Structure formats: C-alpha cells, structure tokens
Amino acid sequence: MASISDDGMALSGYLKKLKTMKKKFFVLYEETSHSAARLEYYDSEKKFLQRAEPKRVIYLKNCFNINRRLDTKHRFVIVLSSRDGGFGIVLENENDLRKWLDKLLVLQRNIANSNGTAHSPYDQVWQVVIQKKGISEKVGITGTYHCCLTSKSLTFVCIGPEKTPNGEDRVASIEILLTTIRRCGHASPQCIFYVELGRQSVLGSGDLWMETDNAAVATNMHNTILSAMSAKTESNTNLINVYQNRPDLSHEPMRKRSSSANEASKPINVNVIQNSQNSLEFRSCSSPHNYGFGRERCDSLPTRNGTLSESSNQTYFGSNHGLRSNTISGNRPHSTNKHSNSPTFTMPLRCSESEESSISVEESDDNGSYSHYRLNTRTSETAIPEENIDDFASAEFSKVTEPNESDENYIPMTPINPTDAIHEKEKIDMQRLEDASLHFDFPEHASEKLAKDYDLDSDNQCVRPIRAYSIGNKVEHLKFNKRLGHLNDTGQNPNRVRAYSVGSKSKIPRCDLQRVVLVEDNKHEFVANRSQSSITKEGSGYGTSGNRQKKSTSAPLLSLKNQINSDRMSDLMEIDFSQASNLEKQKFIKNNEIPKYIENVFPKTPRTDSSSLTLHATSQKDIFNGTKLNNTANTSEDGYLEMKPVGNAYTPSSNCLPIKVEKLKLSDYTAPLTTAAPVHDLNKISTYNISAEKWREQTTSEEKKSNSPLNEKPFSLKPTNVENISHDVHSTNNIDCEQVSVQSDKQNNLDDKIVENNNLDIGGHEEKKLVHSISSEDYTQIKDKSNDFTKFNEAGYKILQIKSDSSLISSKLYQKGIHKDNLERSHRLTESVNTIPDNATASSSVTKFNINAKAADSRSTDPSTPQNILQIKDLNFPSRSSSRISQPELHYASLDLPHCSGQNPAKYLKRGSRESPPVSACPEDGNTYAKIDFDQSDSSSSSSNIFNT
C-alpha cells in the first residue's frame, strides 16, 4: 500500500475488477486544489510508478451512488454507479471492504457538501436493461438504466446518451414511489424482473420488464424491493403527506396499503420457484442499510394472514416485527401458527377492511392473536366471528360465561342430542343478556337486523356455534317467510326447518291430491289431465279439503298453501309408498283415468248421467257406496306399489278387465275402409288376452244378456279380393287386424262402453286405438251436440265379452302354465282393422259366413263342437307365447249385432274418420250374440270358427 503523497493519494493497492476478476492496481485520490477526487487503476504497480496513463479514471463527483453489493457470488464487492455505468471492485476481506467503502463515502459526502447539494444515497443499485414492452416504449424508458432503491421510492437513472440510435428521447431519471407499485416478480431462467405499476404512479398503470446480468440479480432485486415495500417506518408512513404539502402526521399510524390488483392481472409467464427458508436467511443479512426498515406493508398481490415463519424467522434484531416473505415464491406453513405471548393491543396492527379498496389485505406483527377474526372498521364495538370461533382468544371480545368454557367451545362431531330444558333455558337467557349489549349503528340498516342473528329459535343451537350472517341476510330470509305466512311455524319449531328449492313449498304430491280430492269428494266426476300431470275436479277450482296424511320425511314439512299451481307440478313425479286407507278406492282412482285420445274426441263440457262412464264388472255407484270387489288374488301385497312394467305386471282379478269399454262403430260393408297400417296379409285379427279367472266372474252377466230374444236375419257375404286402399293413416301399429262391417238401422240405447288399453306397448307417436269409419258430418255433429248422444239411429256392434278357451283347458284357476302365460299377456289389447274394398253394389260381399242368431249359454261353449263352422284361410294371428302352450288356445268374443235394415248406412257410416262416435244403445232391446273362435295355435294356417248362437 502506498501512503498519501502530495498529489492527494489516499489509498492504493491490488484489487480485482468485478467484471473480469483480474487483479489491477487501484489508486484513490482526494480532492485537491488542482485535481478532483477520483479512482484510477493500472495494470500493475510498476506502470503506476512509471507514471503511465491509467487504464480508467472514475471521478467521484460523477458517481451518484457508492455502496456494497450483495447479489453476486463474491462476498466483498463495492460498486460505484455513475451515468457511464457501474464499476465493481472485489476485495479480499471485510476489513479491506470497510476501509475502502468508508473512504469512498467520505469523499462523496465532501463533494456534496462543497456543492451545496444534499446527498441521498441509495440502498441498492442494480444495472438493468429495460425492454420495449408494456409502458416502457410509450413513456420512453428503454435501454440500460440503473435501478436504485430507497426506503420510499424506486429510481431509474439513465446510462449512456439520452437519445437512442433512432433519435428517440430517453428519460434521464424518474422516481416511482413504492406505494404506487402493485406487485413485482422475476423469472429465473430468463433473468427477467418486472414491476407492475398502479394508476397513481408517475408513468401510469402498466408493467416494466427489465433484464439483469444473471438470475441471481433478478432474485435479489425481487426480494429486496419486496422487503422495502413491506417495511414500515415513520418516514415512509408520512411520505404522501410530505409530498402533497400536508402537515406531518408521524404520530398517527397510516392505513395499511391494500392491493388494487386482482388475480386477473397476474402475468402467467413468471415462474418463481425457490426455497422459502433460504430466501429468508438470505434476506436477513442483506444490507446494513436495511436496519432502518420497519414499515409494515402488504404487497400488491391478494394476500393472506401472516404466519409464524414470516414473522419471527425474518427479523434483523430478533424481535416479533419482521419483513414479509415473498408471496409468489415461498411456502406458507399454516400449521405452525401459534398464539402470541405479546400483550394485546388496543389498535390492531392488521390491515382492516376499508371502503376504498376492493381487496382487503391482512398483515400483523404479532403471531396471530387476531388470526381468526376480522375487525370491521365501521364499528369498534363488535367483531363478526368466522368459522374458527374456538380459536379466538382476546381480552376485548371474549366473554367468560361459565367455568367450563373449554367444554362449550368444543364442537362435537357426533349427532347432536337435545339437552334438557333447564340447560337450554339457561343458555337462552345467557344469550339474551349478551344480545342486550350489542348495538349496531348502520346508516342503511336498522339496529335490530344483526341483533336477530343470535336468535336460538331459528336453528337448533344445542352446542353448535352461532352462525355468522352477513348484513341483512337473515332478516331478508325472515321477511320472506313472513310474506309466505310461515313465520309462526318456524319460530315455534326448535328443530331445523327443511330447506326447499325454489317453488317447492307450494307443490302438493300427486298422491295426496288423489287421496284427498278424489276419494272424499265422491259425488263428482273426475278427468285426468295428462298434459299437466295433475288430477282436477270438474266444476271446481284447485283446492284440497281434509287433513293431509303426514309422509315420512327427514325434516318437518312446511304448511301447505290453499292454492295449488298446476304448472309447478308439471315436471314432478312422486311415488307414494305409504299404506292406503282404502285399497279399493285407490284402485278405482288408478283405473279411472281416461286416455288422452278419448278426451280429444269428446268436448270438455259437463256430461249428463246418461253419457257418464260405466264400469263393466262393477259400477261407480257400488264403489262409492263401499261395495267390495271380488278379489281372488292374494291381498297380502295391499299398499305395495308394483314397480314392474305395466304390460307385464300381475294385478288382482278385479282389475283384469278394462273398466271402460270403448265404443265401436260398424262401418258400411259396401264402402272401402282405411287400415291402421299397411296390410300385407289378407285377413288380420285383434284379440284380447285376458286371464281365465276373469271369465268365470262374467258368466252371470253374459247369461242374462243371452236370454234376450233375437230377431236377427241371417245373411251371407261373398268372398272378394282384399285391397289396401289407404296408406296415409298416421299409426305405427304392427298388429294384424280384421274388422267385420255390418249394416243396421236399429237404434241401440246401451250404455257407453269404452275400452281403455293401458297395457299396450306404444310403438309410434300416437296411441293404439280401435279404428272405425265415421262420416265427417257425424263428427261435426258430435262436436257441436256432444251432450245428446241418443239423437241418431246408428248401426254398430259392441264387443261385450271376449273369452279365451284357456279357461276350458283346466279347472284350476292358477295352473302353472296358464298363470305364466296370463301374467305375461294380461291387459294386452291389440287393435286394428282389415280393409274391405267397396264394389259399389250392396249385393257384393267381402267374407262368406253365416250367422244364425239364437240364444246360448256362454259357459257351455265348447271349442270342439264343429257345427256351423266356416274356415277362413290365409289368416295371420299374433302369438306372443305360443311356445309355452302346447295346445291351441281359442278366444271367444260376444258381439252385439243389431238388426239389419234396408236403410242406407252411408248416412251415418262413411269413410275418412278414425274417431269413435258416441253410440247410445238401450239394453232392453233385443241383441244378437255371436261367438268367434280366434285360433292362435298355428300362425301359418289359422282359422276363425264362427258359432251361431
């Protein structure tokens, strides 16, 4: 080392350049009368002694900052920053570092004092290259700059010329307050550091992207700037007031800075992955200038509560007041949270919720005394507890109610059992005393709104903590219940009220409607509206009378409304598994529905008693009077709802026959008929597959009708070719069919019998129905005059009974083979017609057969009797379970054949309509019965045996 000479040399020696790490001979000169303070270096000491030209001269007056640098891999580095760039010196040890750094700083201060300028050194200076990205190009900050950090601002100083090679101006120097920085981060692989500025900054809102020498510099910039943003000092607290010429308010704490950024403004290309513990240890010894840092400040990201690792492990003096860790990089061990032993503060150190900021940020110097509570800045009298109420321990807000307070704060996870009445009463009284001390004063809310939040009557509060509501939340819920008229029910019920979806409280189950409306009001007629899936009573509004049977539910049902909205039940299907009070009434209600296609034919006006629905097996009057139906099936399954498909379900014998028999119209045998589907075979037929035991019940009614005198004249029809005339009938039934057409002018006053086919599998868009021919004039007359069905003289036949010979095979009702077959084919109705062309003459006939009308008993019919049988060839009959039955099965149909007449049948029977007109027949008139044998044993060569009865 050379001593101070006459030319002002202060220090000299061999040091290393930071950039090349080569040893050079450095000489430091003080300011003299004929030279300025400067730093020179030579290649060697020999050249210095030879008075050679120095390799570089750095004047201290041009250096705006001289400090120690810690972001390099070398420990002892001094950097001199000037407008020409930065120059780094690497020393051997700490003593040399202190000696050279102190001498340089003394000389720099002397220069500032001589010039009359205040010297404000920077804590950290980094040399960066600002990229043309974000707002940098717009404001003119591009190229190489010094990034200088102080406790209150971040300054960018231009390096090099103030004009770019393109002639654009560059900003020489600009200072950005730390309070206007939203957030910062770095990308390690790309050596990129960025800063996001807010709207209150000098440059406006935007991002500044800068490139550093290496990734270590970018990491150090991020940690150091973030620590400065999170520090708390009195000077930085009152910085805004000083800049705006306001009085110094250092004795009053400044509101903690909350973030104005949200998650959407985060750059997604910034990946910061580093060890939290290493970064904390690295920052704890960053710079001696950091000793003055103390301002607590939340960073610009949406942040969270401070943890133990961010408070005690990040301190410089070992106190509880420390620096925040990097919120981007760093783990947050929440499990290490512990209550602080420090005394409670009257003024909370955490950033509270404010009206100015959209995102509230919470920071604290203590280790979580208020970690589970938020203090509302609008009032200082109470705090709203959140979920972790058992962790709250504060002398200001906690109230000691009983000695065993720890037992009350414990929340059991077992099902809550109701406590005794005395303990419950004590808790309610204690809670009312606490509620009396609560006072809320909001300009837009009444004081009693939040006072009702601690009402124990609304919920079952055995040992559970009180639920925290937002402002006005529960009050609006109570107002809604009051408008609905349920306030008294919920207030008197200590249990938890069942939660309903929107509009579900006004829904009444369909089973309750059937039970209440249809069974009790038994003197009215009912129409099942399938479009709305509800049952309504004709001539009256929607309403229920009587008591509802309470269903088994997990929560108490709320009271029902008197008015029922049918639209709300349009998308609801409920299944009632409860025991029915009267099984027979329930079965009648189930089978009393009218098909939709029958409702469309008749007008929806009130019907007279003459046109009302009648039953075949039993009458409606007998059911309402309490008459028991003959039920041969086992009744052990009463009340159980069969979940099998309707077509395959086995029902008791009382429900085997259809309750209503559809009116069938006899078309003109001289007019062509339209078919339900394109006919590929000559003769098609439809049958009823009905169990054998049902026919045993119907023998008495058939015997009575068979005794009536028959005056029918036999007639014959000649066989002709069969044509398929019309293919445009909208139906998709694949069932072979045959229709016999007979002309008649006899007026029949029989009761209407409607066949309801509930068990057919619908293969198309419209339901299967018996197809008949009716003129368009008759259809118009029916629509206009639907209440009078007895005005027309119509010819037709009615299928009174259909009997299978399965009842003749064996005397047992429940034989195994027959039971399986009847179980599969019960309630199946196949309907269709056979097309008969018109030959334009009344003498032409379709099928040749003889019908000799005479009275006979249906029970004595034997399929083996061959008298008066005409074979009809080329018939295809549907057979579903022909493999199960080894012997032929015959089906008999009792037909009501009215008297033939010479009147023109075209007056009433015409082509072109498929609806069944109303037929009124008198049971007192003489009827003709014929039994037709439909043989299903052989599908290839089937026959039809017609018996003259």
Curated annotation (Swiss-Prot):
- Return the InterPro entries for the record: IRS, IRS_PTB, PH-like_dom_sf, PH_domain
> Which PANTHER family does the entry link to?
INSULIN RECEPTOR SUBSTRATE, INSULIN RECEPTOR SUBSTRATE 1
Q: Where is the composition biased (Polar residues)?
A: 304-345
Region feature Disordered, mapped onto this chain: 247-270, 304-373, 530-556, 696-718, 906-949
Q: Which gene encodes it?
A: chico
Q: In chain numbering, where does the motif YXXM motif 2 fall? A: 640-643
Describe the location of the IRS-type PTB domain by residue ranges.
122-236
**Residues where Phosphotyrosine occurs?**
Y410, Y892, Y929
- What's a single GO BP term from this record? insulin receptor signaling pathway
Q: What's the protein called, per UniProt?
A: Insulin receptor substrate 1
Q: How does it assemble?
A: Bindings to phosphatidylinositol 3-kinase and SHP2.
Residues annotated as carrying Phosphoserine in the record are: S286, S287, S342, S554, S913, S916
**Role according to the record:** Activates phosphatidylinositol 3-kinase when bound to the regulatory p85 subunit. May mediate the control of various cellular processes by insulin-like peptides. When phosphorylated by the insulin receptor binds specifically to various cellular proteins containing SH2 domains. Involved in control of cell proliferation, cell size, and body and organ growth throughout development. Also has a role in a signaling pathway controlling the physiological response required to endure periods of low nutrient conditions.
